[in-house]
Amino acid sequence: MAAKVDVKSLPACPAETTLTLISDKWKVLILRDLMPGTKRFGELKKSIGSVSQKVLTAQLRDMEQNGLVHREVFAEVPPRVEYSLTELGRSLKPILDAMWNWGEEFKARNA
């Protein structure tokens, strides 16, 4: 279960709070890649590309702690770990969609 975020330590501005939670480049890509559904660590690493294993692990742990990502460990040999978005993580879809649309429009205007 994700640890409760200390709301008092977050910025007063809601937009800044959102940026605090997802502003890292890798976090946005993790959200993008988990929107369609559950993925294993290796699948995430492959789909994101140039992120190191250490950084991806740290980002996933941070997102899990903030309640955006659910990590499920299966007692198998070899061990299997799957990541999925929580309801809170999925609630970021409209924000990611808006970022996607804005990026498409920006590229079209500057082509």
Which residue stretches match the model-derived regions?
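HhH-family (HhH-GPD) DNA N-glycosylase catalytic core used in base-excision repair
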Residues: M1-L10, T17-L19, K107-A111
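N-terminal helix-turn-helix DNA-binding core of bacterial DNA-binding proteins
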Residues: S9-V55, P79-E82
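Hydrophobic alpha-helical core bundles mediating ligand binding, dimerization, or RNAP-core interactions
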Residues: A15, L96-G103, K107
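Residues within the DNA-recognition helix of helix-turn-helix
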Residues: Q59
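Basic, amphipathic "hinge/linker" alpha-helix immediately C-terminal to the N-terminal HTH DNA-binding motif
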Residues: A75-M99
